[in-house]
Amino acid sequence: MNVTQQHKELSPDMVLSKALLNVGKALNLTQVELASIVGKDRSTLKKGIKPDSVPGQLASLVIRLYRALYVLVGGKKIDMLHWLQTENVHTRGVPVDQIQTVTGLNDVVNYLDAMRGKT
């Protein structure tokens, strides 16, 4: 099977799951942390996430967070990790801890969107 055929066979559920796992790797988040953020069991993350489900919407927010942060720091991984792991007076906490709740994830994504001028 060539690469084109392989991509055609990926369902939206699998694409979202794979994107979330890739973001997790880029941000040094474990599968356990990702699963906790999106409200799924770690063992089910690789089986796909329905985009229109609550976990799917949360996964999309995590991906949006990554994309916004990537743009803001010019794609520098060390700066992305520093931002995530450092106390932030504007978000009133440490973003990596804040994104463990739905409210915190939403607040952090909204903050990043505002910083990018996407309000």
Over which residues does each language-model region extend?
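Non-transmembrane "mature" sequence context
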Residues: 1-119
